[in-house]
Amino acid sequence: MNSQDLKKRQEKIRNFSIIAHIDHGKSTLADRILEKTETVSSREMQAQLLDSMDLERERGITIKLNAIELNYTARDGETYIFHLIDTPGHVDFTYEVSRSLAACEGAILVVDAAQGIEAQTLANVYLALDNDLEILPVINKIDLPAADPERVCHEVEDVIGLDASEAVLASAKAGIGIEEILEQIVEKVPAPTGDVDAPLQALIFDSVYDAYRGVILQVRIVNGIVKPGDKIQMMSNGKTFDVTEVGIFTPKAVGRDFLATGDVGYVAASIKTVADTRVGDTVTLANNPAKEALHGYKQMNPMVFAGIYPIESNKYNDLREALEKLQLNDASLQFEPETSQALGFGFRCGFLGLLHMDVIQERLEREFNIDLIMTAPSVVYHVHTTDEDMIEVSNPSEFPDPTRVAFIEEPYVKAQIMVPQEFVGAVMELSQRKRGDFVTMDYIDDNRVNVIYQIPLAEIVFDFFDKLKSSTRGYASFDYDMSEYRRSQLVKMDILLNGDKVDALSFIVHKEFAYERGKIIVEKLKKIIPRQQFEVPIQAAIGQKIVARSDIKALRKNVLAKCYGGDVSRKRKLLEKQKAGKKRMKAIGSVEVPQEAFLSVLSMDDDAKK
């Protein structure tokens, strides 16, 4: 095709994504669009078609983004090329959303006609506005008995400030309004800008590892054209590769002769190592490079850290390989090797949130068959020492000695909670119990309230979300952004078994709750750790000070069983001998700590504040 034809083709391209809160019907809408445009035959059709991971289908959530090309013949008789980029809706996967939005010109905002706007909807809309996208509101599930499309349209106008007069009323499940949505995409979403004759600039928004072809890049072509045989160059590190294949997804990969400006597809170039490609990097041609890289998206910083250790120590290298493969298309997962006296060799991993941590753990166990021990999650603290240094600490066992600490700052988040009016009291009580500071409260409509609190991230990573759902019968929706670091009265609590510190059980706690939590955890460990041949003291300590203690009584063999009557001094001699043996055993004996003990540090929060 010459450049005139390519420019004409470019005018027919529409790149869009679907943004919505969990369960508002995003994946179902994507399924209907695929059916309507006959991208997928009815024989291949299955629910949640784009959620290809087992985990996504089971949990009913979208974790990874997906990009698909569809052809749609509009009412004006022209055939348009649509690129649908499916995005996740959960707060932990916001970076996936921002990546997919960077590859689009428009976004379909799906709002449930019964539930209305939720916290996560708002967060994603702001991301779309940051990327200057054309937003098309769709009120979904209008066939539900509880649907109230008028109220929801008012919410869209009042809360988000979008004009909802032309919002499409649809039901993805029943297939109502799908054609209207497709027509609006044609009319309202702008065609991609960019110059086919300019040097190649392609944004990498995802990558997948293929055992035979190496790393396969998913790209959005912003300027220029790429075809097999070209020599491409990564702009961040200057490495070059020969393109072996380019193509699109329909959802299956289909090879093409070229990818031109505005296209969204894949590039295979025998890239062997994961480290050579970074999501957000710009690809250009080695012989005619672009002058500057594209404005990528900001690197997401992990908010939650935890240690991951293989239960069988010989699986350490397998775990490293598995993490590297996951990191390939999950740019926000970070890890570095660490050792623990209690757990051996493992990795300290950084995650965006608890769901992200959960998903990574499940993927490691399922896809790579590795049995893991996870330590309690912690956040990044700023520890200011007496010699005026500031250390960032994400692992409690790396905390400096208390005598060297001047003060500690912890991260606070701005939590936005949307909840029906009757549960406002429960939400405020929970937030205050989690050391939250009230900021403001707005009424969205007669019944729903938007409550904003500043809460320490450390309190949120434990079980804030579960507690919030249970105290509001599942009606609350929740979203948070990093806010600032603040001074807090924090201390490090160590757990000692038989006088030895167990590094993997250490945790950071607010001074106010230290005694309570120490007491709860030693009692929990007493129940979990099996009895030994000798007595085992369990102690909770802050620095040198023991704040709680509990003893596991020794198992005792009855050495007097074979003495029928007889001299008391004979019995005493046997008992003394047993006592000396126990003493020697206690001095050299080590205590096996079961997996549940590490998890009990996580769940102690339940009891600490009842």
UniProtKB/Swiss-Prot annotation:
**Catalytic activity as recorded in UniProt:** GTP + H2O = GDP + phosphate + H(+)
Annotated tr-type G domain residues:
11-193
What positions does the entry give for GTP binding? 23-28, 140-143
Q: Which domain of life is it from?
A: Bacteria
One matching Pfam family is EFG_C
Which SMART domains does the UniProt record give? EFG_C
- Places the protein is found: Cell membrane
What is the topology of this protein in the membrane according to its UniProt annotation?
Peripheral membrane protein
Cite the EC number.
Answer: 3.6.5.n1
The GO terms describing molecular function are: GTP binding; GTPase activity; ribosome binding; translation elongation factor activity
GO cellular-component term (any): plasma membrane
Give the UniProt record's GO annotations in the biological process aspect: positive regulation of translation
Gene3D superfamilies for the chain: 3.30.70.240, Elongation factor 4, C-terminal domain, Elongation Factor G (Translational Gtpase), domain 3, P-loop containing nucleotide triphosphate hydrolases, Translation factors
Keywords, in A-Z order: Cell membrane, GTP-binding, Hydrolase, Membrane, Nucleotide-binding, Protein biosynthesis
| Alphabetical list of PROSITE patterns matching this protein | G_TR_1, G_TR_2
Chief place where the protein resides? membrane
Q: Which SUPFAM superfamilies match?
A: EF-G C-terminal domain-like, P-loop containing nucleoside triphosphate hydrolases, Translation proteins
List the InterPro entries: EF-4, EFG_II, EFG_III/V, EFG_V-like, EFTu-like_2, G_TR_CS, LepA_C_sf, LepA_CTD
Q: Does the keyword rRNA-binding apply?
A: no
User: Into which EC class is this enzyme placed?
Assistant: hydrolase
Q: List the signal peptide residues.
A: none
HAMAP family xrefs:
LepA
Q: Describe the task this protein carries out.
A: Required for accurate and efficient protein synthesis under certain stress conditions. May act as a fidelity factor of the translation reaction, by catalyzing a one-codon backward translocation of tRNAs on improperly translocated ribosomes. Back-translocation proceeds from a post-translocation (POST) complex to a pre-translocation (PRE) complex, thus giving elongation factor G a second chance to translocate the tRNAs correctly. Binds to ribosomes in a GTP-dependent manner.
Protein family per UniProt: Belongs to the TRAFAC class translation factor GTPase superfamily. Classic translation factor GTPase family. LepA subfamily.
Query: What protein name does the entry list?
Result: Elongation factor 4
